[in-house]
Amino acid sequence: AAYRKYEKTGFVLGESRIDLMPEALRRYRDELRGTSPAGPVSGKTFRLISGRSPWQTHTITQDLYPAGDARRRVTMLINDRDAEELGLQSGDKAVVSGTKGSIRVILETSADLRRGVLRGQYGWGTSACLLRFSLEGSYNLNELTDADALEPATGDACFGDLRVTIRREK
C-alpha cells in the first residue's frame, strides 16, 4: 500500500466524508472557549461534581457498616482555602443550593480538591425504601439537578456543570 498524506480534515471514503467535528460541536467548543474553568472561588458559585467514596458501592452499603465506622460518613468536600474564606470548617452543617432546590450537608475540607469545586457523594439520600436507617448529613444530589438543562453537544443532562452556592446552616 502506498502512503498518501491527507490534506483535508476528516476521512475520505469515496464520495462521502466523515465529519469528525460537526458544526454543532464546533459551535459548542467555541462557546466553551469564552468561559473559564472552575478556578478560585468567586464568593458566589461553585461547580458541583459527584462520585463514590472509596468504600461505597451504592446507597444500600450505608447499612452494611456499624455506627461510628468511617465508611458510613456522608460529607460534602470543599477546598480548605475556600472553606476558610467562607468561615467554614470540617464538621460544619451547610446548605448547598442550586436553581432547582437545596440540600443540607456536613462539610469536610480537603487540600486535594480544586478551588471553586464542591464534591458530593453519589448514591446517598434518605428516601430509599430499603434503608433501615438514614445517616446524619445524608443528601440526594438529584434534588439539585435541573432536568431541563441539557448539554448542547450531546443532549445529555449537565451533571458535570452544575453551579451551586453554599452557606452555613442557620
Where are these regions (language model features)?
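Long, contiguous, secondary-structure-rich segments that constitute the structural scaffold
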Residues: 1, 59, 64-77, 81-170
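Long, low-complexity segments enriched in small/aliphatic residues
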Residues: 1-66
